[in-house]
């Protein structure tokens, strides 16, 4: 009977899974991120499937590919669907009502939550009412959905309070009439995407530079450390704000600036120190004596033994990057409206403190996200603790 021993990495992964709080937090973060990436399929003002005059359209599915550059997205004009409107683009929610009244073979399937993160609903926020006498005007006594709960039927009244599952907007709308729930979900996608991009790029650059400085040392290390000291002295957030004020930043541009300005420095210091420690050990001397190339020694021998500190640091880096984006957006130097972001929601809330829902819900989601990432970092730190699986005791 043969037995296979587990590697240290397998033991660490097994240990991480045994820490339920961190493991389930990781699963939940990943699940919510996937759900947010698939947002166009369930939070969108465009239909999943539309059959009109024996032609089929799939607008929401096309929206799912909006991150691919170079794709020409079709404009669905109101006249194509015989919709009388002063707007060029068709109102699919209104089209659904029109199709439901007809019996001509047309068909439309809207997403579960039919609102778009960038959609301005200010001219569509009339509280719904039951037009009993069919005069197209609200008359006293007709039943209505009291979204702002003031006991009166209202027109065009953003921001609206949360209507729960009884009304149209689960968490209400902001001061521009955009749905808060939709913008929180889209903001989650943008925040996590930004944090992941910055963290991954910072790690790639930091590991490469730190490995070279720690392994080759000498004048290269002296020059590299002086360069890092110069970059460290630069006020990161203020510099980013100045650069952002001269351009129209998107997620990728902001992430790139964050990495180049300071994101790579902390990882470089960690890896440099680990390489200094590891290259003095016998297995490195043995590899050198066997004629192994420096690149193989650095990235196949030393690097795998140097990653523990930076792996445990990764979740904290993600938290820091999320707060960087939130801070920039809150101050007005980040992503430009109508792009959804938690910082932009909080900035709107600061101007509308009497509308509690605009402040409470983004803060709750941001806090829960930070807590879950913190649980993940604690679990990783405990699972990758070198004392647990050390052979030298």
What kind of feature is each model-predicted range?
Residues 173-393:
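Alpha-helical transmembrane segments of integral membrane proteins
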Residues 1-203, 207, 212, 338, ...:
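Gly/Trp-centered helix-boundary motif
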């Amino acid at each position: 009977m043969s037995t296979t021993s587990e590697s240290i990495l397998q033991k660490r992964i097994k240990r991480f899974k045994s820490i339920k709080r961190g493991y389930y937090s990781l699963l939940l973060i990943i699940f919510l991120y996937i759900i947010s990436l698939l947002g166009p399929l369930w939070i969108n003002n465009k239909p999943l499937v539309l059959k009109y005059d024996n032609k089929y359209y799939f607008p929401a599915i096309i929206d799912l590919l909006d991150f691919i550059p170079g794709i020409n997205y079709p404009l669905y004009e109101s006249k194509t669907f015989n919709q009388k409107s002063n707007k060029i683009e068709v109102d699919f929610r209104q089209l659904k009502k029109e199709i439901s009244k007809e019996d001509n073979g047309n068909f439309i399937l809207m997403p579960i939550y039919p609102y778009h993160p960038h959609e301005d609903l200010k001219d569509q926020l009339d509280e719904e009412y039951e037009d009993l006498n069919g005069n197209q005007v609200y008359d006293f006594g007709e039943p209505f959905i009291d979204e702002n709960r003031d006991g009166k039927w209202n027109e065009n009244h953003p921001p609206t309070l949360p209507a729960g599952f009884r009304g149209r907007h689960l968490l209400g709308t902001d001061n521009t009439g955009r749905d808060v729930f939709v913008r929180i979900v889209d903001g989650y996608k943008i925040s996590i995407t930004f944090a992941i991009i910055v963290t991954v790029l910072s790690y790639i650059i930091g590991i490469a530079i730190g490995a070279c400085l720690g392994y080759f040392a000498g004048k290269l290390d002296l020059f590299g450390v002086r360069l890092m000291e110069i970059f460290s002295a630069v006020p990161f957030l203020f510099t980013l704000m100045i650069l952002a004020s001269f351009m129209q930043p998107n997620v990728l541009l902001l992430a790139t600036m964050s990495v180049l300005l300071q994101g790579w420095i902390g990882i470089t210091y960690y890896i440099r120190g680990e390489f200094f420690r590891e290259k003095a050990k016998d297995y490195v001397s043995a590899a050198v004596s066997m004629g192994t190339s420096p690149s193989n020694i650095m990235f196949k021998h030393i690097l795998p033994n140097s990653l523990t500190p930076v792996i445990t640091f990764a979740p904290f880096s993600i938290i820091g990057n999320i707060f960087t984006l939130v801070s920039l957006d809150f101050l007005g130097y980040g992503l430009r409206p109508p792009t959804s972001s938690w910082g932009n929601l909080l900035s709107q809330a600061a101007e509308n403190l009497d509308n509690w829902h605009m402040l409470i819900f983004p803060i709750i989601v941001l806090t829960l996200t930070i807590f879950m990432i913190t649980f993940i970092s604690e679990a990783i730190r405990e699972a990758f603790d070198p004392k647990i699986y050390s052979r030298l005791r």
